[in-house]
């Protein structure tokens, strides 16, 4: 007896294909984020959309697309806004294969330089803050960024990639489903874990930091979670003199990384 196919069963393969397609594609927009990706990994390019004003500047990209039979198309402003789901695309959008993050264990078990520097984000979900911190990490040569996640999909949204201005291609991103355990493993490897929290008693500029170092940033509302804070060797704050008690987390990250980068240039291991 033939069994009838239900409407759900008919649509399920299409849903699965759409889900896989979504996981296998990542939309970049903004000139620096797009061109950094193209220069770093042109083989990941899938298709390109651009404005008339950007057409001449994208000559090399269009030649590459032609040679590799990849679609590219000039669009008007309204159409570009729809593809990017916003207006901050600067006239260029690239759909690429995503750089899927690896497990933090790979970073922790690997070889870290004596003056290595890693950044960990604890519950920082705002894409603008993620992107700004990623850009700062790239500027100071951070060797890895660890973010909560399971590693099965991209954890950096397109808007964060745009804010990073190419930083996504410069800084390896790793994920951990259990940040306290990852920080414990970092300490077992001899890495010095510094947490940043506005309620800390110790100030950044008085703290004695050792290397390799891990800097942990918490979200602006709650700071570091208690379990994460317990795994830090030291918790510091950026001292201020004004009426406001705290900084935007991406600004605080910039100050902290600048100070720690300054120290690691002259750090001598005992």
How should these model regions be labeled?
Residues 35, 139, 159-167, 226-270:
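Structured adenosyl-cofactor binding patch, chiefly the S-adenosyl-L-methionine
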Residues 43, 50, 60, 66, ...:
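RNA substrate-binding interface of SAM-dependent RNA methyltransferases
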């Amino acid at each position: 007896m033939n069994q009838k196919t239900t409407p759900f069963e008919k649509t399920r393969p299409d849903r699965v294909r759409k889900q896989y397609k979504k996981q296998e594609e990542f939309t970049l927009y903004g000139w620096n984020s797009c061109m950094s990706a193209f220069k770093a990994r042109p083989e990941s390019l899938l298709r390109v959309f651009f404005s008339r004003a950007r057409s001449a500047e994208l000559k090399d990209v269009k030649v590459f697309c032609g040679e590799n039979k990849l679609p590219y198309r000039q669009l008007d402003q309204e159409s570009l806004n729809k593809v990017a789901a916003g207006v901050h695309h600067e006239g260029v959008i690239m759909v690429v294969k995503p750089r899927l993050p690896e497990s933090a264990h790979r970073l922790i078990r690997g070889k870290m330089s004596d003056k290595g520097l890693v950044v960990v984000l604890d519950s920082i979900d705002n894409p603008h803050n993620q992107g700004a911190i990623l850009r700062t990490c790239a500027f100071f040569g951070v060797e890895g960024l660890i973010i909560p996640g399971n590693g099965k999909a991209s954890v950096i949204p397109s808007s964060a990639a745009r804010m990073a201005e190419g930083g996504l291609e410069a800084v390896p991103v790793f994920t951990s489903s259990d940040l306290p355990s990852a920080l414990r493993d970092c300490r077992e490897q001899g890495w010095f874990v510094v947490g940043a929290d506005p309620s800390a008693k110790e100030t950044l500029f008085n703290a004695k930091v050792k290397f390799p170092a891990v800097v942990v940033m918490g979200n602006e509302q709650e700071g570091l979670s208690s379990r994460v804070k317990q795994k830090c060797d030291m918790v510091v704050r950026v001292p201020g003199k004004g009426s406001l008690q705290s900084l935007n987390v991406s600004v605080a990250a910039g100050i902290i990384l600048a100070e720690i980068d300054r120290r690691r240039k002259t750090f001598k291991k005992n």
